[in-house]
Every structure is written in C-alpha cells, then in structure tokens.
Amino acid sequence: MSTNHNYSTNFERMFTMKRISIVAAFCLIIALSFALPSNAASKKRVWKIAHAEFEGTSTYVFAEKLKEEVEKEFNGEVDIQVFPAGQLGSYEAMQEQVQTGGLEFTIPTTAPIQTIVPEYAFTSINFILSPEYMTNYKALNQGETMKFLGTMLEKKNLRVLKWLPQPFSCWSSNTPLQKLEDFKGLKIRVYPSTQIIANYKALKSNPTPIPYAEVYSALQLNVATAQENPIQIIYSNKFYEVQKYVIISNHTTPIDTLTTSCSFWNSLNKEEQEKVLRAADKAALFAINGMNATLKDSLEKIKASGNTTILELAPKERERLAEASKAAYTVYLDMCKDNGAKVLKMWKADLNKFGTK
C-alpha cells in the first residue's frame, strides 16, 4: 500500500513538472516572438544615398523624393537613408564609396566621373548644351551619347541610372561681367577639372581650382573673386553674401547623375531594377516641376538681401562669349582623341533629335 502511494505521488509530481515545463516553453516562445524581429522586418534592406547639396536645391528635392518613391515601390521592404550636404565626404569620396560597396547610390555632377572617364568632360564645355532644358534632359536620358559613354563607365564598376540637369548656371562676381573683355584676368573659382579650367583660359581668365566646401571662404577672402553655379546653389550656399553681382548667363549647367555600382545593380533582379528606375523617373519629374518655383524664390531672396545686384547678359555678348569658348574644344579633343570627336558628333545629333522642331 505504501509502495503504491509513493508511485502515485511520484507520477503526479512528474506530470506536474512536465506540465510546468510545457507552460514555460510556451511562455518562452511568446517572449521570443516579441523580442525577435518579425520575418518581414528581418528582411528589410537599408540603402544609402549621399550627395553634397543643401535643402532648397533640385538635388536635395530629387534625393528626398527618390527615397519616398523607392520605399513605396518596395512596399516598405527597403529603407532609404539620405545623407545630404557632403556628410559622407567630397564627390570623389562618395564615388569611391559606391565603387567599393560602402554606399549604394550617390548623386554627383559629371565632374567626378570625368576624372575616371574623361570623355564625359564634354558636358562641362561652356555653351555646348541646348538653351532648352527638356532638350538636354531627353538627350541625356534617351540619346546615344550617354549609352556609348556608359559602356566605358561600367568598366570602372559604375552605372548612371538617371541624368538630371540642374537649372542653368550663372556667374557671381565682385565685378559686373557684361562683356567678353570683363573676363580677362578674372580670378574665377572652378571645379578642379581640366575641361572647366580650359573653358576660362579660353576667355583669358585666371581659373582657380577650389574644393566645393571651401568656395564661400575663398570668395570672402578674395582668393577668388567670381564663381559659377545655378541660382539656387548661389542662394543655399550664401555665396551672394560675399559677391556684389549675379549675372544671369545660362552658359552651362551642372548635371546630376544618380550613380550606383555595377556590383550592386547586378545583385538586384530585373523586377527590382525596374522598381528603382520607375522611382528615379518619378523623382526626376517631381524635381523638374519644382525648379521654376525654387529659382524664382531663390532669386527674390537674393534681391531682397540688398547685398547683390542681379544683371542679365545681353544676347550679343552671349554670342561673343560662346564663340570665344570654342577654343576649349581643342583641349577636349586632345584629351579624348578619336573618342572625343565621336562624342561631340553624337551629342550634336542627339540635340537635333530631341530639340524643339
């Protein structure tokens, strides 16, 4: 009798312990389900976009809209982190980070691309672009010139997904640049590009290469007395504070390039690539639609400062400057040899194809 009682007690104890273990295991599973990320969240990818511009510029607007559209296309499975205002370094540093896989996208102008594929430098020749914004936009994104150059860029593990011209550039200066002769001896800040330097040597100026981040202080200290940039850049970077004149010239335009690495791009499947391209198209058109309002606002604020006089370049003087600037073509042709002549011919054909009839 005593033996049966002990057996029964032991059995009940074992059953109770087993039941406690089951309950504990169930509680642990519930706890872990809250502690660990969901399967969907664990698959979320983080992509970084970096650029050098400030709020109020077309580049900034494009990047923010691109973030919105990519995240929408991927239904929240991708998180886009945007690093504006040169937070991740210079254009060249960001481009290198893309090449080496530390950054998914960057939005530089064509200037840093020219350092590895010189043929892109044609975009920096003064007065070579159409005076019609959408002609340039279509020629860059649909024309044969950039397809041809893209094959060279891919050898450097880079791929341009979208070309987005900024608004046309103007000159800011401490002297009123109203005619060709005014450029003689002018200390103008330029991006450190062989072609851009050649542009101003053709005008008998004294081009002075200065990093973008140092332009304001260089103008303030008279290391340079002039520079070129779109109106919204002149405003957002406060260059007008240290310049007496802004001259509306429309002689060139910085061209933003949504750039990624071939390695990253090829890691995406076709459907994912199409999603990114759709997002880029929408973001570009959104940025373009807002450009006129931004330009007007920036111009009005510069005028309201009372510090800077806005001047227009007379059509006749623009023609004289354009003619004098053709001397810079020889530098491009010498630098790029046969490819240079081919690119210039292709670009002219693209402008004719997409130009206003």
Where are these regions (language model features)?
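Short, low-complexity disordered leader/linker segments with a strong preference
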Residues: 1-46, 356-357
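N-terminal secretory/targeting leader peptides
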Residues: 41-136, 144, 151-357
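Short secondary-structure capping/junction motifs at helix and strand boundaries
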Residues: 18, 146-147
